[in-house]
Amino acid sequence: MVVGDIATGTELLVIGAGPGGYVAAIRAAQNGIDTTLVEKDAYGGTCLNYGCIPSKALITGANLAHEAGNAEEMGIHADPVVDMSQLRDWKSGVVDQLTGGVEKLCKANGVNLVEGTARFKDENAVRIAHGGEGQGSETIEFEHCIIATGSRVIQIPGFDFGDEPVWSSRDALEADTVPERLVVVGGGYIGMELSTTFAKLGADVTVVEMLDDILPGYESDVARVVRKRAEELGIDMHLGEGASGWREEDDGIMVTTETEDGEENEYRADKVLVAVGRSPVTDTMDIENAGLEADDRGFLSVDDRRRTDVEHIYAVGDVVEDTPMLAHVASKEGIVAAEHVAGEPVAFDSQAVPAAVFTDPEIGTVGMTEADAEEAGFTPVVGQMPFRASGRALTTNHADGFVRVVADEESGFVLGAQIVGPEASELIAELAFAIEMGATLEDVASTIHTHPTLAEAVMEAAENALGQAIHTLNR
């Protein structure tokens, strides 16, 4: 048993071992900095353990089952049975492999790993509480610190995640049975990904969204493609309704909603999944002791080096204001912060940040929309290629959606792109690279793309913007 407070020191302290924290720690150690990484739960953070990775594993299983059971047109007749316990075990195996890999990578790069919960004592020291009662604590003094504590799911009034019928996204990913009836509160990207997944696994799914469309933040024609497919999967969509509560009934639960006009509606379910967003975790570390102050939503303000108002303390990932809550953003911010600590002349550039939604079909976006470009003072030119004109898309039997490229008419520089369709999450990387390297429409259009591939649609969209498309009518 460890008693008392042990004092140690480190050049760089990183709090949180998610995709922002562990990447920052490894990069700092690679630059010769004495680095200590503190984690209270599991290496890899929410993304690897309770979010991105397990959800994509579950989506893969649901897609395989659905494809196998809906391929009569190809002459394939099957009635697959999904063993949810076995699917969950496979998913957990993937997660365990990756979390173990993160820990090994940190150790191999010379990062000092500490398990516990960090609270600031002042602007140059934290107290680490190790586990439960009697396991002791230590004080770690630091020259620099990176806060990478991530975010937690938002809980709304009337829906306590401690109640058995109420699921958070984490609960949904741990399910060992498929509910017969599932109400999903929230039509954002998490809600729509899980709605689609459970519908494919056999649940009768109802989505309740308080706004007038699903997928806020994405263009309406992109959301329309996903909404149409969701309805084809049997998902019942109710827009303009906010969830107000639930009650137990003899045969399950009843979820109550209310419209802006005060009209109440009720939906019967076995489980209700609340997926209305996430909030930053900055309220558990006594940040005020370090001279830091979060805004009224809990976010920290940083500069383009990811420095907070206390210059030797950095923040990356979901705790940072005005940046998207995306794992790859956190990782890039972590690299920027670590390299700045090492004295490198770096800065975070957000103009080419891709985002993906793993619905059916998938969504991939990067950079500016046409409206964004106009607002920024550009005269945009837009090219679009429907997947129904793609031979490869047709051979996959998934040809809904399109690739759209936005460019500056005068210079030809690619400014942004929106993709909704098969493998959009993969295809968007080409256009993120185009923006990052300053490519023009001509660069993209003149690059020979393999045939037959989905990526040809990117080339054709650029050709369409130039008025040179072959396989679709020029705009």
From Swiss-Prot:
Its cofactor is FAD. Pfam families: Pyr_redox_2, Pyr_redox_dim. NAD(+) binds at residues 186-190, 209, 275-278. It comes from the Archaea. FAD binds at residues 39-47, 56, 118, 318, 327. Disulfide bonds join 47-52. GO terms for biological process: 2-oxoglutarate metabolic process. Belongs to the class-I pyridine nucleotide-disulfide oxidoreductase family. The active site is a redox-active disulfide bond. This is Dihydrolipoyl dehydrogenase. The lineage of its organism: Archaea, Methanobacteriati, Methanobacteriota, Stenosarchaea group, Halobacteria. The gene is lpdA.
